[in-house]
Each structure stands twice: as structure tokens, then as C-alpha cells.
From Swiss-Prot:
Record bears the keyword Cell inner membrane: no
Species lineage: Eukaryota, Metazoa, Chordata, Craniata, Vertebrata
Protein's name in the database: Protocadherin gamma-C3
Domain named Cadherin: residues: 32-135, 136-244, 245-352, 353-457, 458-567, 572-685
Bilayer topology annotation: Single-pass type I membrane protein
Amino acid sequence: MVPEAWRSGLVSTGRVVGVLLLLGALNKASTVIHYEIPEEREKGFAVGNVVANLGLDLGSLSARRFRVVSGASRRFFEVNRETGEMFVNDRLDREELCGTLPSCTVTLELVVENPLELFSVEVVIQDINDNNPAFPTQEMKLEISEAVAPGTRFPLESAHDPDVGSNSLQTYELSRNEYFALRVQTREDSTKYAELVLERALDREREPSLQLVLTALDGGTPALSASLPIHIKVLDANDNAPVFNQSLYRARVLEDAPSGTRVVQVLATDLDEGPNGEIIYSFGSHNRAGVRQLFALDLVTGMLTIKGRLDFEDTKLHEIYIQAKDKGANPEGAHCKVLVEVVDVNDNAPEITVTSVYSPVPEDAPLGTVIALLSVTDLDAGENGLVTCEVPPGLPFSLTSSLKNYFTLKTSADLDRETVPEYNLSITARDAGTPSLSALTIVRVQVSDINDNPPQSSQSSYDVYIEENNLPGAPILNLSVWDPDAPQNARLSFFLLEQGAETGLVGRYFTINRDNGIVSSLVPLDYEDRREFELTAHISDGGTPVLATNISVNIFVTDRNDNAPQVLYPRPGGSSVEMLPRGTSAGHLVSRVVGWDADAGHNAWLSYSLLGSPNQSLFAIGLHTGQISTARPVQDTDSPRQTLTVLIKDNGEPSLSTTATLTVSVTEDSPEARAEFPSGSAPREQKKNLTFYLLLSLILVSVGFVVTVFGVIIFKVYKWKQSRDLYRAPVSSLYRTPGPSLHADAVRGGLMSPHLYHQVYLTTDSRRSDPLLKKPGAASPLASRQNTLRSCDPVFYRQVLGAESAPPGQQAPPNTDWRFSQAQRPGTSGSQNGDDTGTWPNNQFDTEMLQAMILASASEAADGSSTLGGGAGTMGLSARYGPQFTLQHVPDYRQNVYIPGSNATLTNAAGKRDGKAPAGGNGNKKKSGKKEKK
């Protein structure tokens, strides 16, 4: 039954020899599994459950990318990923795969990832008896002389069986006869061949020919056979046969030896003479197939030469049988054996196969990350087959040997996509032969990006200068920012943030394009309103996590000449009359026109000129000071009423201008002359009303202050009683500074901004208790001009200066209730003539001092009861403002009024230029400070 089962090929899968050897079980990366399977199994034949044998999780095969890797062009095996069974995928013919090799093994690799593991599976293909022995010829003819002595051996044709092992050729059988016997011999490669042995002398006359049958049998079950008819012709005697000088010859030859290379020369001799002694050499009948294609034999000389191309990897040793025959009528032959050893040369370059590539690789991949798996083979032997692999130096990769002929490509240093986004690795495999042969393959490794770079800019801050009255929506800045990461991580978003506690600047004044970083203004900017903006550009990328960069953006508004000069004195719309006695000499200071400009720099520099008067030769005006003086003595013929129109121009481009009108009355300095101008009584009545309201306000504020103080004291006492161990009640002290001045502080709520602080100074020699305004808490009178009188509430301005008064920029009616004496004329010394050709101030500080001085003069000029000749140290101001009036009391017109032409600087008693009050005013200053503290 067993032979019949093998013959029908119905061997069940349960009878497969499943020899499983787990070699190196402690090292999973080097596990080798062995299976044995007969050849010629049908497609789908189950070999074994390789997944279970490897200890792998069947459910994770797809996730780990389980696959079969085979270097052959045909894939003989596959693995069912659902069951884990390995099955036959293609026809297995052992003779086709391995020829006559004693062992036939098909090797394949199984690869799984996450983590990357490699398993080797060796399937031994078992031979079955599927091939009959075969003779190279259909029949064999022998000519044997009757003189041949018994015991002579005659080689017979050898049969060839492709099967191996027990299924190969095992023996020969000879048909029954009375002359010959059969002797079966074994070669060095364990193959069998037969020899015909003469046991009884032949008698040609009795039997001139013989018919024998040679049968070749293999060892299979059932045994297969082949028959060869042998025709023997009995010849007449040639009693001497050739003899070789040695029965075995050995030779060594390089596998790359060219055709025609001599291998060995055999030599045989025959004692006969004549044709019976002439020897002819030929290949014996026992040679294996292919010998005649590789070697050539000279029939006369017996020289064995190379005919074809030898291959050490195919056959390492060739066994050649040579026979020698004479030329006699009945030639007898002699035989010898030649063993040709093929010497290996390094004629095969290594072969590289990339079995798995992990790409792209994240640039933050840790050291030792597996990138690719490579298999390297070399068909040469010995040192010629020893292969090493290498990558070019200087790259962040290395090769390590994991299994025999397998190399793992790993990372050996940190990767940076921004530096090198892609590598084309030239992997070289080199053997140890001489000369060394090599192979080259390219492995492409892409580096994937991670968000490891924040947005970058060429500069950390930007200073932008933009002219006021700009066009809304026009770009003012394009931020130059980039991100070296990949496009997704480098997608930038721009935002504007505000610096400090001030809010609302971004949505009110500026905006930024979120995609391209272009900053634009939303509204026209006003230099006089705000000169500087401090913003922060926040740039974030599109990566995860988000990286960001902040850039400071400082926007400076530059001035344009968009404000015409304004007249401070004489007040616009008012009736300003200056008295000029007849007989006044030339150079007498008549009055001073005071103007200011809301612009800055050159745009605020003012110049004065007379447009017209009844007598052009009588008056002259300082170009830069605005001082009007007599150009010649006043004569009796001069008109008693002179109307002067002063043109005030700034220094901008284009220049803007305004005019001021001043009336000069030439009088005899008598009461009748003064009565000609009755309009001066109105300001006095206004001043009476103003004084009344100021006193009433002062009383109300004082009462409120006292009530507040008492309330605070009562509250403190109450708290002290509750926790007398922890708190001490403060004692409030009121100080009254002695002196001629009555000083009261008042905070005017509701009419002005809360940050403005106003002080009212009442002096004992003031007839109408004229008020002055100051900016509170300023260390210098030259602070920002954004809080000057031009921003005051007009109602409050009229309440302080009188019902007919107007804030700067509005002209008030003239005040005729006073007259200037020579000592009371406006001027830096009270009596000196103005310098019409004076130079511009030397520096900004001098300019600011002069502006403050002229504004103070303008305030006195607006008051008909004041004088302008205050003496030294007061810059021409009234004596009543001497101790108290410092630069602290002047509204901040430091950049709005520029009247050059004088090099004089304002100094205090100590000669300093910081605008501090002199020693005589310390009492009032301390009193004011205490009230501010409260």
C-alpha cells in the first residue's frame, strides 16, 4: 500500500514530515524554522502553521505588515495571513531546483515590522521517485577479441537517474549468459556504474556474437528501471592491449581559464606493432553529461584541454574517463581516470537586494532607528565570498550585520530636514577577493518634517516712520518673516498685540494681514494727537505644537504742516487797543503779538510782518519776536488811531499764515483820550463776575475738603477703636504758609479730563484775582503739549478768564482799561527795545524757555490791570507773579510757540535752567505738594 500511495501522489498533509527546529530561540531576530516536504506537491499544499511556530500574534499580522521575502524570481511558498498556514504556491521539482545535489533546500525570509523582525524559513524538498533511469544510447555495441583472457572488464554505458538518495540509481542487472558477469562499481560521488567481466573465453567460431540486456534499477518504491541492449561481436585476437602509465591523473585549473588551456596529458602504450600498436585516445563511456562540452581530448597525443567555460560555483570537481585503443583489427582498450579540480577565482560581484525600506523618517527619530533591510549574496567561495557593506562617511547612517548575508541600515546621528531633506544613500557591497569586486545600490531616504523651528525674522524690531494724514488702508510695513520648516509647519499667521496697559490701539488705528504680515493703518494719523505707537507683532506657525515669535513694531508719526498759526495775543475777535503818547521816541516798545503753531519743528517756527498801517514809517515789528515798536518819533501829524494788521507765517512747506489786528491810540495821555474807548469797561465787569465765581468755588471746595477730612478722621478713629493694637490713627495737620499770596487748590470735575490739575493763585496786589492754569505733577513745564490750554474746555476757559475770554485759537475783544507805561511794555527786560534782527534760539531748551516766557507775557497782556515790567529775574513779568510764577505755572506750549530772536534763557535764583521755583516761593510750593498728597 505504501508504494502505491507514493505512486499516486495522494500523501495527506498530516503525513508531512514537519520537523520544526527553532534555532536560536533566545534571539528572535535569528530564528530559523525548518520544514520538510516532498517534491511535486500540488498548489495549496499546507506546509505548516509558520505563525504559530514563530509565536506571532495572528491578529497583528496586517498591522505589522507581515510578508514573505524571497530572492528567487518564482515564489514557491506563500503564507495565509488569516490562518498563519504556509502553503505551496508553485510547482516544486527537486531535479529542476537542485539537480543532483544531495540536499535541496528552499530558503525564504519572513519580515514583520513595528518592530522590525526577520525570520528565516528553510524548506527541505524531499525527493520522490518520479524519474526512471535512462541510458544515453538506445543500444550498445561491443567488439571483443576472442583472445581476451577471462577476467577482462568491459565498461558499459552508465544510466542516469535525476533522483537522489534511495530513489537514485542503485544497481544494474545483466541478462543470464554463460560468458559474462556483471560487476557494479561506485564512483567517488556515490553514483553507480557497471562493468562487464568476461568469465569464460570466447569462441568466435562457436558464437560470433552475443545479445545481452543491461537493466538499471533505482531504489524507489516501487523501483523504476531502464534496459540497454548490448550487441557483442567476437573478433579475432589482437593479443596486446594498450596500457596507461597510471590509472589516475589529477589536475587543477582556474575557473576563468580560457578555452584551449591545457589541463593534463595522458599516456598509454601498446606492445604490438603496426596498426595494432598505434593508440587512439577518446572519452570513456562513463563520463557524466557535460564533460564533452567542457573539455577536449586530442585523439593522437592524449592532451586534455579546456573547451567550454568552467564555473566553480556549478561544479568544483570534474571526473573524466579516457580510454586508449590500438588500431588493430580487433583493438583492445585501456581506461584511466582524470580528476580535474576547479580553483575558484573572484569572478562574481556581490548582489544587493533591498527587502524593506522605512521612509520617510521623522527628523526627530531616535538613534538606532531601522531604515532598511538589505540582503547581500556572493556566489564565490572562501574569501571571495566574504562580503562587507558600507555607506559613505559623514552621513548619519550606519550598517550593521543582523544575520548571515543580511545588513540593517540604521540612523547613527540626529537628522535635520531643514539641512538635508532627502538622502540618496550609495550602499556599496565589497567582497574580500583579489581584486575585490563590488556592487552599488541607491537607497532613497526622505526625512519628514516636525515643527522644531519657530518663525524667524531678519530683525527683532521695526521702526516705521509715517507722515500724518496718511491714506487709510495703505500698507505701512511688510514684516519679513519666514519659517524653515515644511510648508504645513511653516504656514504663518500674523497678529498685532498691544504693549503696556494701553489698549484699543490695534482695532482703532492699525490692522495686520493675517496671511502676509502687511501692517496697514485704519485711520489717518494725527501728529498733534499722538506721535508714537508701540505694538507687538505676534507670528505663529501652523505646526503642532505651535511655535511663535514676537517682533516689536514702533510706529513714529512725523509732522506735516497742517496747522495754521494761531494768535494768542491780541485775542482774536477782541478789542485790543494800545496807548501810545505823542512825542514817543523811536524804538519805543508798543506791544507784542504772540502766536503759536500746533505743528512741530520747522513747521512751528513763526515769523511776523506788518501788512498795512496808516503810516508805514511809524511802526516796525520784530521778524521773529513779534514786538511792535516805533520806527521814528511820534509826531503831531500822525493819526490818533492806528490799526495794524500783523501777518503771522510758519516755516512749513507750504507755508500757512494768519493775521492779527491791533489798534494803537496816539493820545495826549489824558482822561478825555481814554474815554474815547469805552469798551474797556466790559472786561472789568467780567473780571468782577469772574472773581465772584472763583471765590464762591473756592469756598465750596474748601467746605467740601474740610468735610472730607473730618469724615476721614472719624472713619480712622472708628477703625482705631476696633483694632487699636494694630492701627494708629493719623493726625491730619493743616499748614498755612505765611506770605502775601493766598493759595488754594481745586480739582474741577466733569469739565475737564481727570488727569488735569488746576491751581488758582490769588495775590494780595491783584485787583481782580487773576487766575493762572498749570498742568499738575509735571516736573517740567515743557511736558507734552497734548495737555495744553488748546485742549481745555472752552466753557471752563471762559469761567476762569472771564465771560468774554476765549481759549487759544479764538480772538477776544480788546481790553482798554489799562495803559502801558514805558516800563510796562512787553520785553525780556521791561524797557529794552526788541531786536528785529535777532537770531533763532541756539537749542531746543532755549526755545522752550522763550515759549514759556512769551506765553506768560501774553497772559499778562490779556489782563488790563497787570504790568509788564517786573524787573530783573522775572523776564518782564509783573512783580506780583515774581515769587510764585515759575515755569511750572505756564501751560505747555513748548513746541507750539517758537519766537526766536533772543538768546536769553530763563534761570531761577540759583542760576539753574530746570524751571524750579526760587527760594521765595518754597512756601507755596510745599503747601501745594501737601494738598496733592492728600
